[in-house]
Amino acid sequence: MSKIKQVIAREVLDSRGFPTVEADVILTSGVMGRAAVPSGASTGSHEAVELRDGGARYMGKGVLKAVANVNKIAKKITGMEASDIRLIDDTMIALDGTPNKGKFGANAILAVSMAVLRAGAADKKMPLYDYIRKIYAIKEKNYLLPVPMLNIINGGKHADSGLDVQEFMIVPNVSKSFKEGLREATEVYHTLKGILKAKGMVTAVGDEGGFAPHITKHEDVLKTIMDACKKAGHSQIKLALDCAASEFYKNGKYTFEKKQVSSKDMTKVYSSWVKKYPIVSIEDPLHEDDWDGWLHITKELGKKIRLVGDDLFVTNPERLEEGIEKKTANAILIKLNQIGSVSETIDVINMAHKAGYACVISHRSGETEDAFIADLAVATNAGAIKTGAPCRSERNAKYNRLLQIEQELGKKASYAKTKVFKK
């Protein structure tokens, strides 16, 4: 296997126009791997540190410090075998020396981690998903193409729509293939645009490509999406929510539709929606540290739908272990930059699978054209992926990569569909 010859980093722009870190890893064979990391808007307080420069430049969001830190990392990993990804990741983590990557920044470490894997795959002339599976000894016989969870109406921190809930998603979980599922969901998306226009509503899109109409009642959104599914001829499509409830929680209460309510009140709201609408998944329905509330909602809804922990778990093994012990939630959202290295991410996925928790591979609201997570989803047989609406190139880059993978694998792969979501 070739060794690392050179590591180069630079500041590039993400989909929101703010800087992020891109890294190139060049091997002695001459091949190169390149990766750019994403950035979140609504972030869990337990996430690894995304190092920013501060000051006036780019409104304080520059990443020149993180870029400079990649140069420090380069001195330690140059000469290492590209296939020794765990050793490389461990070396970077040890070099940082903090529990949350606060010294070098998760954005610096992750960019290198991803780029090393890309370089290794190129060196072996293997697709990235195959290489990830081999290098981490992932014991899966077949390949699953993930069910896409498409965020078609944005609220919360992703838009100025006035909605508390951050994402309203559609889930084509009974389609014949990924290709067909994406087509059906895309037809619903465009039908929804027509419905909103007919009602005189704005069809501008939010950070993740979903529409951001000024609707104040959440049930009105659910009804409108159901109308779009029916009108598009795809009434079999299911719904999912990302509530990002930590964003509307303060002093033990949730400010929901301009009322102060408790976690039990919120659970009643969600339960009523699950009865009325074909909702198969709710992400972050409660605050990230509201363990009692999470336990209650898991007892109420855990056998009916997916309850996905994002801010609750932040792709962190210690947080996930606590959730497993407390029997809270039944699924975890996987975001590479929450933990800050690919090796640690794989370990969390393995832990979740072993405990019977479902995994959803996810983008961030501040994305790049890098489609690494598409390969990650297929490599790990996660079965589900969240990467926005079928709009904006940084979102479609992931969907297009999955279309390529589905074609490459042919009969070796199947679409996850009802194996993953049941309702």
UniProtKB/Swiss-Prot annotation:
The family database entries (Pfam families) matched by this protein are listed as: Enolase_C, Enolase_N
Binding note for cofactor: Binds a second Mg(2+) ion via substrate during catalysis.
* Compartment(s): Cytoplasm; Secreted; Cell surface
Which residues make up the binding site for (2R)-2-phosphoglycerate?
Answer: 166, 335, 364-365, 386
- Which Cys residues form disulphide pairs? none
Cofactors named for this entry:
Mg(2+)
- Gene Ontology annotations of biological process type: glycolytic process
Q: Does the keyword Metal-binding apply?
A: yes
Keywords attached to this Swiss-Prot or TrEMBL record, sorted alphabetically, are: Cytoplasm, Glycolysis, Lyase, Magnesium, Metal-binding, Secreted
| List of catalytic residues | 208, 335
EC number assigned by the record: 4.2.1.11
A GO molecular function for this record? Answer: phosphopyruvate hydratase activity
Catalytic reactions of this protein: (2R)-2-phosphoglycerate = phosphoenolpyruvate + H2O
The EC class name is lyase
Broad class of the protein's primary localization:
cytoplasm
Entry's CDD domains? Answer: enolase (cd03313)
- Residues binding Mg(2+): 242, 283, 310
Give Gene Ontology CC terms: cell surface; extracellular region; phosphopyruvate hydratase complex
Give the record's pathway.
Answer: Carbohydrate degradation; glycolysis; pyruvate from D-glyceraldehyde 3-phosphate: step 4/5
Q: Output the InterPro entries linked to this UniProt entry.
A: Enolase, Enolase-like_C_sf, Enolase-like_N, Enolase_C, Enolase_CS, Enolase_N
Protein role: Catalyzes the reversible conversion of 2-phosphoglycerate (2-PG) into phosphoenolpyruvate (PEP). It is essential for the degradation of carbohydrates via glycolysis.
Q: Which family is it part of?
A: Belongs to the enolase family.
HAMAP family named among the record's database cross-references: Enolase
The protein's name is Enolase
- Which gene carries the instructions for this protein? eno
